[in-house]
Amino acid sequence: MSVPAELKYAKSHEWIKLEADGTVTVGITQHAQELLGDMVFVELPKVGRILAQQEDCAVVESVKAASDIYAPLSGEVIAINAEVESSPEKINEDSYSAWLFKLKPANTAEIDGLLDANGYEKLLESDAH
């Protein structure tokens, strides 16, 4: 399984990409979408919503289960990916390009608490045993 090195990861299987303008893009990992299976519904947070770190803020539903998505960082939702709301299967096609929402972080120090690719791979290995 490919774990992109340029991203950071939450233990709850969300990824973040730090953008050049200081905002972050959030999605779910390949591992998460594989566990869930074929996506059928996505509910994203409203633009302007203020999120606390680890607050449940979105829902993805698959043919197997529904799962909450947690904010990997605190901040304000500044954009959502309406394309995945109308075509949830895009998450299955490529979970790293089918982002869910963008945040303006309230506290960039929280990024340091997230896992790097190596740390996330170790988490997956420990989950497998």
From Swiss-Prot:
Transmembrane segments: none annotated. It comes from the Bacteria. SUPFAM superfamilies: Single hybrid motif. Binds 1 lipoyl cofactor covalently. One of its GO terms (biological process) is glycine decarboxylation via glycine cleavage system. Gene3D superfamilies: 2.40.50.100. CDD domains: GCS_H (cd06848). Residues 23-104 form the Lipoyl-binding domain. The keyword Cell cycle does not apply. Keywords: Lipoyl. Its cofactor is (R)-lipoate. The modification N6-lipoyllysine is found at residue 64. GO terms for cellular component: cytosol; glycine cleavage complex. The glycine cleavage system is composed of four proteins: P, T, L and H. The glycine cleavage system catalyzes the degradation of glycine. The H protein shuttles the methylamine group of glycine from the P protein to the T protein. Belongs to the GcvH family. This is Glycine cleavage system H protein.
